[in-house]
């Protein structure tokens, strides 16, 4: 069913690209395939199929102006995809992507190669779009678009890595919180707990506060301490004394 939907969407994009690019090169089917590639990346990255996209890449490069424009469209498509993800999932989406990048760079050499291809794809697109496309060999450009196609073909694998990275990150954060953070809070709490009564004793001895004020401060301190300990027991599981 998903394959049928993807095929229908592909045909729809072809029709749309004919309409919006008809005045430019309506009879140039290869150019239409270029537009299809960028439209798919921009609006439906989850329906990309790496093999199909690679077959749609033209066998020759057209004019520099068209090439620049097409690369700009691709970059805009990538940006739209990121913006759409942020709007849909909030800024937590950015953290998931960062976790994914870290995971990609640390899991294995294969993942590092894939990650490098994706980065190279964006770099080559930007170079061709804003600098001199004549300096780029066709094989390099093909590799760049192949990286984007790989991104589309491996979207499920990427989602798996993102989920796995989230789980690993959560586990690492939990471990760090359980050891470093809680121990620091515990030691800080002990220091404050022992220091504050001595501080009040000094104030009383120097006559800064009266006996009545001292008693009121001790009561207030004891009340706050009890509330803190209760919250710690419920939320952070810090042991009582």
UniProtKB/Swiss-Prot annotation:
Topology relative to the membrane: Multi-pass membrane protein
Subcellular location: Cell membrane
The entry's keywords: Cell membrane, Membrane, Transmembrane, Transmembrane helix
Top-rank lineage group of the source organism: Archaea
Membrane-spanning parts: 7-27, 37-57, 72-92, 110-130, 138-158
Entry GO CC: plasma membrane
Name under which the protein is recorded: Uncharacterized protein MJ0998
Lineage summary: Archaea, Methanobacteriati, Methanobacteriota, Methanomada group, Methanococci
């Amino acid at each position: 069913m998903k394959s049928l939907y993807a095929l229908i969407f592909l045909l729809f994009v072809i029709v749309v690209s004919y309409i919006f690019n008809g005045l430019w090169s309506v009879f140039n089917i290869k150019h239409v395939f270029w537009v299809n590639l960028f439209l798919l990346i921009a609006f439906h990255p989850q329906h990309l199929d790496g093999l199909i996209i690679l077959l749609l890449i033209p066998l020759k490069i057209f004019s520099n102006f068209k090439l620049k424009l097409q690369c700009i469209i691709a970059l805009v498509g990538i940006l739209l995809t990121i913006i759409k993800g942020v709007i849909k999932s909030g800024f937590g989406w950015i953290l998931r992507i960062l976790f994914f990048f870290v995971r990609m760079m640390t899991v294995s050499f294969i993942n590092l190669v894939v990650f490098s291809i994706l980065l190279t794809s964006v770099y080559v697109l930007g170079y061709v779009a804003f600098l001199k496309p004549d300096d780029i060999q066709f094989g390099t450009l093909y590799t760049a678009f192949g990286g984007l196609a790989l991104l589309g073909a491996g979207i499920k694998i990427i989602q798996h890595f993102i989920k796995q990275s989230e789980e690993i990150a959560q586990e690492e954060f939990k471990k760090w919180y359980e050891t470093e953070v809680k121990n620091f809070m515990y030691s800080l709490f002990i220091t404050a707990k022992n220091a504050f009564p001595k501080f009040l004793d000094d104030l009383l001895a120097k006559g800064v506060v009266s006996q009545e004020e001292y008693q009121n401060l001790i009561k207030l301190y004891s009340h706050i301490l009890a509330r803190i300990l209760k919250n710690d027991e419920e939320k952070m599981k810090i042991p009582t004394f």
